[in-house]
Amino acid sequence: MQFQSVGNCAPCKDPCPLKSFCDPGLSNTCNIQPFVNPFGPRRAVATWKVNYLISNRNVLAAHCDPDLINPWGIVIYNNQLWVVCNNTDSITNYDLFGNKLLGTISIRNASHNPSYPTGIAINCGGGFSISTGNISRGGLMLTCSEHGTCHSFNPVVDPLHSFIVLNQQITGEVSVYRGLCIANNTLYLADFFQRHIDVFDQNFNRLIGYPFVDNDGSDPIPLNYGPSNIVNIGCFLYILWAKKDPNITLYAVDEPGAGYISVFNLDGSFVRRFTSRGVLNNPWGMIPAPAECGFPPGSFLVGNHGDGRINIFDCNGRYVGPVLAMTGLPLVIDGIRGLAPHYTDFSEIYFSAACDEMTDGLVGSLVKDQVIYF
């Protein structure tokens, strides 16, 4: 069976070297055959070993970093891990083995109060500039926060501090940004509280005319859901919806079947519903699954914060199965948030997790262990 793309993908303007790996419409140029074939008479499935690299507690991982509490977004840049820590208002930086590199990078608001940062995105293009003194550079990384702020960071400008570039509190609008992405020098922010996507250009001017309305009339997304994250994969934007806590609508609830994923064009026009409810449980992390690691070409990995599972979907949103642990049972990582594949050699998939009711933090990696047959 051939995997179909979700649409005709126009060439992207981003000079990002990862586009060839991120676009589900592109073929596996290395001609590596996947180990997982969910449509065959037998299933050969890869199992995965978990490497516990960093935690805020000595007993949980190989390395200890007290700043790693309630981590959310995680990215790999220049073969280094960059992790957003919600409870310590910081970005922490490690090599791929878990050794800490730069000092902790502060993400505080203007009055130095907590901002509770969440998502992080690498800026592959120009723009999103910050400056101090005589130094001005484009933002290397952008983060967002639950207090409705967006921060830009470049170590050349300041190696230990990010700069506030957007602050919705000033406008009087209550915004809770739980995720962000950058595409074609345009910034997209997922406002969980207001139930919409805020869009800005590279100079932080707000853009209008980006609807981001899920028009699936056969299965409308309930009003008590909000966009918990937005992910740029190829030439499409994927919005992950989570259910709001009825008591505190700033927060999402963990609940089986609580989640939707929608696909949009970069202009905010609706493409289709990717998947609804089912195995979703407060989803947040989503990445293209590397075929080189044994996943079906064009498939996706979606991490559930609610039950700690990572589920596999084909490019049409059909559920393939869970990622399996070494035991052959579904892999469970308590409080998993971000996912970051190592695009250089496809040997590992890194993750962040806010374990123990989000009072602890964990960063680790998944390494393919063996192949089992069903």
Curated annotation (Swiss-Prot):
Show which residues constitute the signal peptide.
none
> Sorted alphabetically, which Gene3D superfamilies does this protein's record hold?
TolB, C-terminal domain
Which terms are listed as keywords in the entry?
Virion
Q: Matching InterPro entries, A to Z?
A: 6-blade_b-propeller_TolB-like, APMV_L690
- Domain of life according to the entry: Viruses
Q: Tell where it localizes.
A: Virion
Q: Which SUPFAM superfamilies match?
A: NHL repeat (SSF101898)
The record's GO CC annotations read: virion component
What family, per the record?
Belongs to the mimivirus R640 family.
- State what protein this is by name: Uncharacterized protein L690
Source organism per entry reads Acanthamoeba polyphaga mimivirus
Organism lineage: Viruses, Varidnaviria, Bamfordvirae, Nucleocytoviricota, Megaviricetes
